[in-house]
């Protein structure tokens, strides 16, 4: 029956990526469905359009898990802090890179060994590129910035730099 089926009130998007997820989410929102997604790729690239459709249709779009999953940040940015003059967003938003940098700092591990340990413990994905090159953090920052500053911020507008070239000497100087 499709996403417009009157018996379906919620749509949970689990596909990832931007295509065809964007089409399905827009279709569900247009039909007035509540949509739940953790798709930071989609929100970082097409958040304005998706959130705009949710507003236009008075549909509920939930995406708290897309940014700092264990820390509720989206709702406070939208509601509790809406009247504040936010000037910057600072935070640790990627657990994999946080773990790697902590191991390099506290245990003196080199990057390669710290990444291997993170992978062994299940903190790093099989392909950790999005984490260690800063793409994951950049997408999260684009989403949070769009909300906090009430302005369209895309992933491409967020400066990202990975941690793959950080050495023990860099850590020493950072201390």
Give the predicted meaning of each segment.
Residues 2-7:
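Short, small-residue-biased leader/transition segments that mark boundaries at the very start
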Residues 11-12:
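N-terminal Rossmann-like NAD(P) cofactor-binding module of classical short-chain dehydrogenase/reductase
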Residues 15-16:
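Short glycine-/small-residue-rich Rossmann-like dinucleotide-binding loops
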Residues 20-22, 26-27, 40-78:
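Rossmann-fold NAD(P)-binding glycine/threonine-rich loop
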Residues 45, 68, 72, 84, ...:
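Conserved active-site and cofactor/substrate-binding residues in soluble primary-metabolism enzymes
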Residues 73-86, 97-112, 139-153:
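Oxidoreductase and adenylate-handling cofactor-binding alpha/beta cores
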Residues 113-175:
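Substrate-binding/catalytic subdomain of NAD(P)-dependent oxidoreductase enzymes
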């Amino acid at each position: 029956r499709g996403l417009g089926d009157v018996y379906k009130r919620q749509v949970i998007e689990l596909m990832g990526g931007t295509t065809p997820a964007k089409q399905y989410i827009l279709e569900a929102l247009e039909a007035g469905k509540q949509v739940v997604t953790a798709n930071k790729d989609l929100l970082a690239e097409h958040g304005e359009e998706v959130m705009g459709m949710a507003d236009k249709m008075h549909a509920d779009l939930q995406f708290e898990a897309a940014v700092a999953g264990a820390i509720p940040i989206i709702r406070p940015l939208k509601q509790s802090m809406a009247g504040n003059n936010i000037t910057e967003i600072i935070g640790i938003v990627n657990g994999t890179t946080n773990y790697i940098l902590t191991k390099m700092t506290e245990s003196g591990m080199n990057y390669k060994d710290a990444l291997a340990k993170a992978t062994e413990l299940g903190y790093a994905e099989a392909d950790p590129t999005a984490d260690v090159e800063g793409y994951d953090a950049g997408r999260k920052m684009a989403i949070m910035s769009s909300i906090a500053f009430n302005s369209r911020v895309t992933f491409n507008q967020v400066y990202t730099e990975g941690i793959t070239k950080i050495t023990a000497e860099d850590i020493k100087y950072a201390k």
